[in-house]
């Protein structure tokens, strides 16, 4: 079991903890498939809802909040039945807008894993307005059921009445609907190709600034992040922040980053290079490789 879960595992009921420990191996980064979730429910003699709420301390253990020191964990349950953990991330010494909220982390985890719809969000603190707006960008976002400890469950539409969302800006394919933009680039660099692929899968209906970041650690492992825009603009999730969140979920340290690549469209209304460099340089003293590509 990873050291970061030692304290949180003690907060779980013993039968659930005993069933969960084998899953918390070195490669665990917060994903539990539907079959393993069903086994946890059976072994713990708890309901699924009770298990998901009980797992929140495990999700919160993924957090990296050097500024607030407030650990927030979130669990997104997909239509597939799989669950995806996420946690808040803050960049030391940097402006607060660089922060990743736990719900954003969990949703990006699900998106990068190929999930097509979120049906439940379990979180250990009431979602802030920023996160409510971010969730509203998703497929049937208003119908996502929000679960909080010691509170009744409600749909997102309860927490965000009279919502402004993608349809108000004539966007008919919201976040998590698979969309692919093709770009022209001649490269044999595997890391650049990976970034290009993820840029094509990014979500930028308001600026067409399709973009992705890939980070590489010294052992050759790579961690990606895609741009995810929001109808309200400010809650958009930047690709560097998503990549850094992905890296920390996998229990990797910022000091291990050896290479960083940003690929973005030449036809976008904005560029993400400045924001990406600021975030990267807050945690790693390496240069950002910036590649601009033309859509086909």
From Swiss-Prot:
Its cofactor is Zn(2+). It catalyses: cytidine + H2O + H(+) = uridine + NH4(+); 2'-deoxycytidine + H2O + H(+) = 2'-deoxyuridine + NH4(+). CDD domains: cytidine_deaminase. Belongs to the cytidine and deoxycytidylate deaminase family. This enzyme scavenges exogenous and endogenous cytidine and 2'-deoxycytidine for UMP synthesis. Substrate binds at residues 88-90. GO terms for cellular component: cytosol. It comes from Shewanella oneidensis (strain ATCC 700550 / JCM 31522 / CIP 106686 / LMG 19005 / NCIMB 14063 / MR-1). It is an enzyme of class 3 (hydrolase). Pfam families: dCMP_cyt_deam_1, dCMP_cyt_deam_2. Gene3D superfamilies: Cytidine Deaminase, domain 2. Its EC number is 3.5.4.5. The keyword Zinc applies. Binds 1 zinc ion. PROSITE patterns: CYT_DCMP_DEAMINASES_1, CYT_DCMP_DEAMINASES_2. Residues 47-167, 186-296 form the CMP/dCMP-type deaminase domain. It comes from the Bacteria. GO terms for molecular function: cytidine deaminase activity; identical protein binding; zinc ion binding. InterPro entries: APOBEC/CMP_deaminase_Zn-bd, CMP_dCMP_dom, Cyd/dCyd_deaminase_Zn-bd, Cyt/Deoxycyt_deaminase, Cytidine_deaminase-like, Cytidine_deaminase_bacteria. The active site is at 103 (proton donor). GO terms for biological process: cytidine deamination. This is Cytidine deaminase. Coiled coil: none annotated.
């Amino acid at each position: 079991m990873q050291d970061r879960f030692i304290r949180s595992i003690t907060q779980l009921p013993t039968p659930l903890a005993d069933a969960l420990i084998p899953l918390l191996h070195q490669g665990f980064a917060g994903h539990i498939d539907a079959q393993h979730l069903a086994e946890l429910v059976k072994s713990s003699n708890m309901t699924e809802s009770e298990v998901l709420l009980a797992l929140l301390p495990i999700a919160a253990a993924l957090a990296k909040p050097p500024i607030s020191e407030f650990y927030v964990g979130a669990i997104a349950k997909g239509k597939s039945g799989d669950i995806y953990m996420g946690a808040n991330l803050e960049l030391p010494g940097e402006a607060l807008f660089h922060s990743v909220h736990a719900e954003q982390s969990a949703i990006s985890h699900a998106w990068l894993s190929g999930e097509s719809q979120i049906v439940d969000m379990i979180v250990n603190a009431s979602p802030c307005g920023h996160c409510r707006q971010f969730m509203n960008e998703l497929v049937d976002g208003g119908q996502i059921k929000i679960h909080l400890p010691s509170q009744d469950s409600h749909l997102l539409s309860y927490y965000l009445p009279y919502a402004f969302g993608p349809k108000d800006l004539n966007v008919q394919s919201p976040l998590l609907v698979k969309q692919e933009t093709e770009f022209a680039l001649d490269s044999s660099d595997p890391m650049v190709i990976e970034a290009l692929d993820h840029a094509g899968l990014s979500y930028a209906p308001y600026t067409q600034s399709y973009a992705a970041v890939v980070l590489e650690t010294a052992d050759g492992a790579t961690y990606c992040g895609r741009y995810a825009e929001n109808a309200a603009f400010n809650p958009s999730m930047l690709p560097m922040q998503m990549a850094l969140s992905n890296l920390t979920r996998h229990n990797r340290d910022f000091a291990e980053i050896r290479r960083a690549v940003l690929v973005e469209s030449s036809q976008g209304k904005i560029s993400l290079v400045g924001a990406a460099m600021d975030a990267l340089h807050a945690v790693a003293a390496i240069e950002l490789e910036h590649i601009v590509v033309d859509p086909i």
